[in-house]
């Protein structure tokens, strides 16, 4: 709790980007609320503008004296932030408010009241399944109203979300400031439960509303990051997908691209086609000649043409397979071969092989992304005429 950088910067899109691509975002404020003790949660909500150790010690002592009237409310928010409980809420509202890839859900899970767009094709979901501003707002608003309801009313939550979601959707870079036009000094009802301000801590009452606004904003951003896969698309705009559905659609698209196209003729057309005669080759085979022979003959015998063709095809396939293997050689291959002959420690060899495998997997994944990007660019150019 002594890290002075927690939640002191302006809100930025990096807080919602996928954790695998953005490692410089803050720790999830949702997890912090669940894992810390009650007095620390008060600090995360009401005084997150300071993270100096001396300030925290003073504030925690004050928060530990708060009455029983407010404690159950904050404890309820803590329970709502537990990982499984929070994920279930996010899943429920995701099916209600966000675009859906149908192969990730049973038909029984599609709620009748759902406003979601449903896509049955992986390519369509990847191209058109990103949540709009209105869909994203409904989703985040629904979760925050249910999770934070014990201490904040819908109007207080709405005050933060409306401008924050709009500026997030309009952002074009990971470190752009968002939500700068949101009123941060509004009065919150929860403050009336505080009996007094902390002694020897000037400015607490002046900053408590700004801190609460900051808390709601970060809670909203980390809610999006928790449930959604978010990244900038090839058009420079942020894309918001349900994480599990994005992964499923991406995998399905990759599998479909790898499948060979097979042309199947209808049975009726096959019956009408006469069976082609197999051509026959003639091979002249010289008879073994002895010096004593006055003459010798040459044996003429038919040769099965299809057998010759199969033999040549097999030889060509083997040659292509061999050549394909050579094409797939990776830079570290010969190092691995030398490593097998070397007397280096086994743990070093094992670690190196593991790194080589991971490196090759990364190359394959990059190639997949390149193909997907090229596909999207081509489709965009086609739409633009």
UniProtKB/Swiss-Prot annotation:
<protein>
    <recommendedName>
        <fullName>Uncharacterized protein T16H12.3</fullName>
    </recommendedName>
</protein>
